């Protein structure tokens, strides 16, 4: 079974590109990473930084998560990310996403030993 840490990597890590220059990036990646199976995941963020840099966020600024838990961490610096948002008229199985390239701080929930990201909470 896929661990929470592995799921985070599948859903949120794309270290192979510095940015998502293509407007079809989200449509391709959401499908490739199995987030359009059975339904269209409405919102997802990909991080274009090294896995080591994203793991390091777990030792940066401790902040509250959206759900009230206290195991979220905010990156010190802005990271290259891509926001994928399902377009209003898109219906499964034709998941059609808006691709937005951003540089923002990220907030992730971390747990385990090693202490690694298991949930993408927000970008700010």
UniProtKB/Swiss-Prot annotation:
Pancreas. GO terms for cellular component: extracellular region. Glycans are attached at residue 34. Substrate binds at residues 7, 10, 41-45, 66, 85. Its EC number is 4.6.1.18. GO terms for molecular function: lyase activity; nucleic acid binding; ribonuclease A activity. One of its GO terms (biological process) is defense response to Gram-positive bacterium. InterPro entries: RNaseA (IPR001427), RNaseA-like_dom_sf (IPR036816), RNaseA_AS (IPR023411), RNaseA_domain (IPR023412). The keyword Secreted applies. Keywords: Disulfide bond, Endonuclease, Glycoprotein, Hydrolase, Lyase, Nuclease, Secreted. It is found in: Secreted. The active site is at 12 (proton acceptor), 119 (proton donor). Disulfide bonds join 26-84, 40-95, 58-110, 65-72. It catalyses: an [RNA] containing cytidine + H2O = an [RNA]-3'-cytidine-3'-phosphate + a 5'-hydroxy-ribonucleotide-3'-[RNA]; an [RNA] containing uridine + H2O = an [RNA]-3'-uridine-3'-phosphate + a 5'-hydroxy-ribonucleotide-3'-[RNA]. Transmembrane segments: none annotated. PANTHER family: RIBONUCLEASE (PTHR11437), RIBONUCLEASE PANCREATIC (PTHR11437:SF24). Monomer. Interacts with and forms tight 1:1 complexes with RNH1. Dimerization of two such complexes may occur. Interaction with RNH1 inhibits this protein. Belongs to the pancreatic ribonuclease family. Endonuclease that catalyzes the cleavage of RNA on the 3' side of pyrimidine nucleotides. Acts on single-stranded and double-stranded RNA. This is Ribonuclease pancreatic. It comes from Mesocricetus auratus. The lineage of its organism: Eukaryota, Metazoa, Chordata, Craniata, Vertebrata.
């Amino acid at each position: 079974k896929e661990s929470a840490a592995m799921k985070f990597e599948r859903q949120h890590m794309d270290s192979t590109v510095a940015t998502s220059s293509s407007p079809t990036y989200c449509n391709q990646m959401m499908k490739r990473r199995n987030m359009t199976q059975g339904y269209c995941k409405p919102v997802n963020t990909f991080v274009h930084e090294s896995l080591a840099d994203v793991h390091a966020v777990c030792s940066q600024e401790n902040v509250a998560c959206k759900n009230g838990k206290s195991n979220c961490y905010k990156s010190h610096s802005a990271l290259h990310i891509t926001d994928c948002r399902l377009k209003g008229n898109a219906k499964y199985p034709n998941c059609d996403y808006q691709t937005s390239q951003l540089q923002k701080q990220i907030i992730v929930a971390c747990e385990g030993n090693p202490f690694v990201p298991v949930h993408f909470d927000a970008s700010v």
